[in-house]
UniProtKB/Swiss-Prot annotation:
Impact after mutating residue 150 to A: Impaired ADP-D-glycero-beta-D-manno-heptose-binding and ability to activate the serine/threonine-protein kinase activity
Regulation: Serine/threonine-protein kinase activity is stimulated upon ADP-D-glycero-beta-D-manno-heptose (ADP-Heptose)-binding.
Record's catalysed reaction(s): L-seryl-[protein] + ATP = O-phospho-L-seryl-[protein] + ADP + H(+); L-threonyl-[protein] + ATP = O-phospho-L-threonyl-[protein] + ADP + H(+)
Record domain Alpha-type protein kinase: where: 1017-1237
Name of the protein this chain belongs to: Alpha-protein kinase 1
Biased composition (Polar residues): 652-675
Keyword flag Zinc: no
């Protein structure tokens, strides 16, 4: 029986019985005892024997018959899967009967026995609920190491890396001890440790730490060989993983690994190239597990991939290319033949592997014979199978899964028929590999003997530090038997806790009075107290345990919502003259640029309107889009715009609950008026937010006020009367509102001026632009710019050159000399048709004065407005803070007003919220300017809400492009055979930059369908981008607590992901972007990973028990035939609470212990890069005490070398880091002997 629904129902019944027994424990009836005995007697004798041996704790893992035998007889070639599958229903009935009879030892033995089989059915989560329930009912019940380790595997798959690391490190450090389990042999402990080391290697592989992962896999091989009888199954798995790692490993790392005197694998000595070594390792892996089809399928898939990659590399001699392709063909065919016609395939891992084998074989045929009709048909079938596979993996209905599984395998059968896959003759009909794969299994794969325990000692520091992070007391002391030796039990391993001691919103959120600001010091104490309290929470014999068990299942059966920390309370520690915390109740604001905060398109209006659901977020730690002011007196000059206020109604505020923060003086927000002009304009009050349901074209405005005040009301304005002596509108509130909208600002669309700004009131005073410089504002076309409050954008070295653009359909436009606009219109988002969508409330840095060539906020005083590059852009001109311009009398109709922005706020990053018409900001992922070199535009029909656009990803355009330009873009998007060869072999940044230069911008890729794609990985060590052909399915948007403003995130499943059962997230920009946005994101993240790897080594050398990891990121270039249709970045899904430790300018959160390590890492990156780079903008997942493991993502890098993206401030950013964030070296810096540089403020 392998029907998932039936299995799930039976397991649910077992869980319900346990739940009832946990609530009340009646005496066991004679009827229950006899039913238990009856069910056990009905089992086949082989299963009864296995249950008895499991009860006696005879082995820590249920062994295959062939697993430890050198000479395998006919009776040993039966797989355990077949035996368990045949009697599964009887076993589960016996499990229920044993629970009712209160024979927890027998029940735990059955759980142990069926564990691996149910993992293949994707229902391990429900089985683990039963195991935990047994432990809670009778804590002395032995729970097998295999079952405990299963929890670690599922945690890795679901993104709970901290949880998995703790379980594995506990077992390794405690010599395999878990609960009351007793080992019969010392070698069994070695086996458990070897498996744990192997899974830790897979975690590092998932994190892109190829060399370090390979070292751990090698260690596991040593452990398996150290057993009295080598574990062939363990060796097969480790060799396959090692080969898979070699595929991604750089040549330099491979040479280092190969030449390491402690690593003595013989297969490394036989081959010079890492891909050939990997292929041989897979051949050996398949031979070791020749009687288990899934193991063979996995191994030969990796072998075929290795040979495919090698045939495309520059190292492969041309005369040997076809030979290796034929070997790859054989490997994929062997994999496809592991499925017999009458055998069902019921698990995601096996289905994925079959689709991958079919695609690999199709790719080989294309390389050998070209794009024939047969190959094209097979390619289409593979994409069809990928779509069905994704639906299978996300479906919760057993009938659907069963039908989809059959459909997938039916498609695979068609591929086999198209490509004429023929079975091979084999003397041993039970073997799934050909005779040519046979080798002497007693062949030494190690030169000499490795000392496994000595190897473990080298990792003991890491395992100890991870264990120290978490509590080890069992939460169930109530029913503990006095004579039971509990040891390290599964409850102590935190298997019932969704998020282990990560810094969370619930731990950090203090109770705040509605109208009272809270000081930074008080808040810090509250946070520490809550962390201490939360870190010592023990689960009792109560509902809390059962609820948490349900949470574990959700992570396996279907993609769960993100659990992110955007609602967490953050405290700001600032150097300089700035005062303490400025807490704003901005539940719609997100303090990071990670994929944890990306948009999920649901209508959350009702949520926004609900009171009492506010999350406190420190808006001052957002990453800025432009620099902060050096001090209050050094504001930039602001240019005036001549436009007319048009159809704007302001509502009268209700200021009953508005009070200033205890730590901040009440500030007024002057509005900057402008001279009248005949063109209609746009007005925005200071800190205004866009209201829901506003009329089309003009939205209501809600006041946000300065961010360093605290308030909890919703002021709105029905009218605004102006007073010349006040410099601001009467009745205008000066406090932030608490709605869950996201911040935005309005930019008038007008051509850039010559920037001849005169000093009207002396230094630091802005002046109006002359009448001749008045620019147009387009009717009913406000440009809603979403300042994401995330990453500051550089203002240096950005040329400002403009073409004149006339578009008759827009009506009368007054043109300026050298004028232009940025044709960077957003694409339509899934929720873009909703009126008055949410926007985040957040202050904007006053230093952001103009918009650069990518829509960046730039400093208008530092940058000339013209050059010869022909870039189109918008310009935003603002008044410096503190300066009050003269205000006209009551009429405001002839003025455009810009807000005076909060001075202690880092600014914004791009986003494209519903209702936005033009997005002029840049996201934290910086990019170069080449993709913005746009063609001239002519009149034509529009699509969506905007009058212009580049050529979109489907090959059509919103307006007509000149024929020649359109042809050039389409040609640039079409990859030629030579391009494919270069990409598959590996290319450098410069080649890729030039090749993609004229591809234009792209709409977001289409979801809910499978695409052909190129997977591109970047190695900082080799500085190469290497491609791999694959198929990707773009799934549903993620359900997240907070919407992102610049990118959408969605589930992604592709054939060549590192972890078949793992979850991956794709990120795509909401608005049309050029390809290089994604590529620079990945380059920057992998550069930060390169630096942090070296930093970790230094920490380890100094016995500092902390390790930092950057989540790896890759590119998927979406293709249709050979034409580029889009681009997304992909990274593993990490589950946990997300925190932001610093930004890329001056803000840093010193109350987190992790920040100390992060700042030391930034300092180290500066020294390690020979004073060229500093990694900043620290954000990710940290533990409560800042020790153990820290996972980071989305960094920024200030570099003196490259200015390819505007979030790089160069020398100025490095100055900010050492003078504002890392003011003094900490203990970590001293222990690493880091030298503090002498910093002088760079000229701007």
């Amino acid at each position: 029986m392998n029907n998932q629904k039936v299995v799930a129902v039976l397991l649910q019944e077992c869980k319900q019985v346990l739940d009832q027994l946990l609530l009340e424990a009646p005496d066991v009836s004679e009827e229950d005892k006899s039913e238990d005995q009856r069910c056990r007697a009905l089992l086949p004798s082989e299963l009864r024997t296995l249950i008895q041996e499991a009860k006696e704790m005879k082995w820590p893992f249920v062994p295959e018959k062939w697993q430890y035998k050198q000479a395998v007889g006919p009776e040993d070639k039966t797989n355990l899967k077949d035996v368990i599958g045949a009697g599964l229903q009887q076993l589960l009935a016996s499990l229920r009967a044993s629970i009712l009879a209160r024979d927890c030892a027998a029940a735990a033995a059955i759980v142990f026995l069926v564990d691996r089989f149910l993992y293949g059915l994707d229902v391990s989560g429900k089985l683990l609920q039963v195991a935990k329930g047994l432990h809670k009912l009778q804590p002395a019940t032995p729970i097998a190491p295999q079952v405990v380790i299963r929890q670690a595997r599922i945690s890795v798959n679901s993104g709970k890396l901290l949880k998995a690391e703790y379980i594995l490190s506990s077992l390794i450090s405690n010599n395999g001890a878990t609960g009351t389990w007793l080992y019969r042999n010392e070698s069994d402990k070695v086996l458990v440790q070897s498996v744990c080391i192997q899974i830790r290697g897979q975690i590092l592989q998932k994190l892109g730490m190829w060399y370090e992962a390979a070292e751990l896999i090698w260690a596991s091989i040593v452990g398996y060989l150290a057993l009295p009888q080598p574990d062939k199954k363990g060796l097969s798995t480790s060799l396959g993983i090692l080969a898979d790692i070699f595929v991604s490993m750089s040549k330099n790392d491979y040479e280092k690994f190969k030449n390491n005197p402690q690593i003595n694998l013989s297969l490394l000595k036989e081959f010079d190239h890492h891909l050939l070594s990997a292929a041989e390792a897979c051949k050996l892996a398949a031979a070791f597990s020749a009687y288990t089809p899934l193991f063979v399928l996995t191994a030969v898939n990796i072998r075929g991939t290795c040979l495919l990659s090698y045939s495309s590399s520059n190292d492969c001699p041309p005369e040997l290319k076809n030979l290796h392709l034929c070997e790859a063909k054989e490997a994929f065919e062997i994999g496809l033949l592991t499925k017999r016609d009458d055998e069902p395939v019921t698990g995601k891992q096996e289905l994925h592997s079959f689709v991958k084998a079919a695609f690999g074989l199709t790719t080989v045929h294309r390389r050998l014979h070209g794009e024939t009709g047969t190959v094209h048909a097979a390619s289409q079938l593979c994409k069809e199978a990928m779509g069905k596979l994704y639906n299978f993996s996300t479906s919760s209905r057993s009938q659907d899964r069963e039908a989809l599984s059959q459909e997938v395998m039916s498609v695979i059968a068609q591929v086999k028929e198209h490509l004429q896959v023929q079975s091979f003759s084999n003397v041993d009909d039970r073997s799934y590999v050909p005779e040519s794969f046979e080798c002497r299994l007693d062949k030494l794969i190690l030169h000499g003997q490795g000392d496994f325990q000595k190897i473990l000692d080298t990792y003991s520091q890491h395992h100890t530090s991870v264990c120290e992070v978490f509590e080890s007391d069992c939460g169930n002391n109530k029913n503990e038997q006095k004579d039971a030796k509990t040891g390290v039990c599964i409850t102590a391993l935190k298997t019932e806790i969704k998020n282990i001691d990560t810094v969370s919103t619930t731990q950090e959120k203090p109770h705040c009075q509605r109208d009272t600001g809270i000081s930074s010091s008080l808040m810090g104490k509250n946070v520490q107290r809550e962390l201490r309290r939360g870190g010592r929470r023990n689960w009792t014999h109560s509902d809390a345990f059962r609820v948490s068990l349900d949470q574990d299942v959700e992570t396996e059966t279907e993609p769960s919502d993100y659990s992110n920390g955007e609602g967490a309370v953050f405290n700001k520690s600032l150097s300089g003259s700035q005062t303490s915390s400025a807490w704003s109740n901005l539940s719609g604001f997100s303090s990071s640029a990670s994929w944890e905060e990306v948009n999920y398109h649901v209508d959350d209006r009702s949520a926004r309107k609900e009171p009492g659901k506010e999350h406190l977020v420190d808006t001052q730690c957002s990453t800025a889009l432009s620099e902060e002011l050096e001090n209050d007196r050094e504001g930039r000059a602001m240019h005036s715009l001549h436009s007319q206020l048009h159809d704007l109604s302001l509502q009268e505020p209700n200021n009953d609950n508005l009070e200033p923060s205890q730590n901040q003086p009440q500030q007024q927000m002057p509005l900057t008026p402008f001279s009248p002009h005949n063109t209609p304009g746009i007005f925005l009050a200071p800190g205004a937010g866009l209201l829901e349901g506003a009329p089309e074209g003009i939205q209501e405005v809600r006041n946000m006020g300065p961010r360093n005040t605290s308030a909890h009301s919703r002021p709105s304005y029905r009218s605004a009367s102006w007073s010349s002596d006040s410099g601001r509108p009467k009745n205008m509130g000066t406090h932030p509102s608490v709605q869950k909208e996201e911040a935005f600002e309005i930019i008038v669309e007008f051509p850039e001026t010559n920037c001849d700004v005169k000093d009207r009131q002396g230094k630091e005073q802005g002046e109006e632009i002359s009448e001749r410089g008045a620019g147009p504002t387009f009717k009913a076309s406000p440009s809603w710019v979403d300042p994401e409050g995330e990453t500051a954008e550089s203002t240096e070295d950005a040329p400002l050159d403009f073409h004149r653009v006339l578009h008759n359909s827009l009506g009368n436009i007054s043109m300026l000399p050298c004028s232009s606009f940025t044709p960077n219109w957003p694409v339509q988002n899934p929720d873009s048709r909703k009126s008055g969508g949410p926007v985040a409330e957040q202050g904007i840095d006053p230093d952001a004065s103009t918009v650069d060539e990518e829509g960046q906020l730039l400093d208008s005083m530092d940058v000339p407005c013209t050059n010869g590059h022909g870039s189109h852009r918008l310009c935003i001109l603002r008044q410096p803070p503190g300066q009050r311009a003269e205000t006209p009398n009551s009429s405001v109709s002839g003025n455009i007003l810009f807000p005076v922005l909060s001075e202690d706020c880092t600014t914004t990053e791009e986003g494209n919220q519903p209702g936005n018409m033009l997005n002029c900001s840049q996201n934290s992922s910086s990019s170069s300017v080449w993709w913005l070199k746009s063609p001239a535009f002519s009149s034509g029909s529009s699509e969506g809400d905007s009058p212009w656009s580049y050529l979109n990803s489907s090959g059509s355009s919103w307006v007509s492009l000149p024929g020649k330009m359109r042809k050039e873009i389409l040609e640039a998007r079409t990859l030629q055979p030579d391009d494919f060869e270069k990409l598959l072999a590996g290319v450098r940044h410069d080649w890729l930059f030039q090749r993609l230069e004229n591809t234009g911008v792209f709409k977001p890729s289409q979801l809910h369908r499978a695409h052909s794609a190129l997977l591109l990985k970047y190695s900082k060590k080799s500085e190469l981008w290497t491609a791999q052909e694959t198929i990707v399915y773009l799934g549903d948007y993620l359900t997240v607590k907070k919407k992102g403003r610049q990118r959408n995130a969605f589930w992604v499943h592709h054939l060549h992901q590192e972890e078949i059962l793992g979850r991956y997230v794709g990120k795509d920009y909401k608005e049309q972007k050029g390809l290089w946005h994604h590529f620079t994101d990945v380059e920057r993240q992998m550069t930060a990973q390169h630096y942090v790897t070296e930093f970790n080594k230094r920490l380890y050398e100094q016995n500092i028990p902390t390790q930092i990891f950057y989540i790896p990121s890759t590119i998927l270039l979406i293709l249709e035939d050979k034409t580029i249709k889009g681009c997304i970045s992909v990274e593993p899904y990490i589950l946990g609470e997300f925190v932001k430790l610093s930004n890329n300018t001056k803000v840093v959160k010193t109350e987190y212990k992790a920040t100390e390590y992060g700042l030391a890492y930034g300092h180290f990156s500066y020294e390690f890069s020979n004073h060229r780079d500093v990694v900043v903008d620290l954000q990710g997942w940290v533990t409560g005490n800042g020790k153990g493991l820290i996972y980071l993502t989305d960094p920024q890098i200030h570099s003196v070398d490259q200015k390819v993206f505007t979030t790089n401030f160069g020398k100025r950013g490095i100055f900010y880091f050492f003078n504002n964030q890392h003011v003094e070296c900490n203990e970590i810096c001293h222990r690493l002997s880091l030298t503090r540089p002498s910093m002088e403020k760079p000229c701007t």
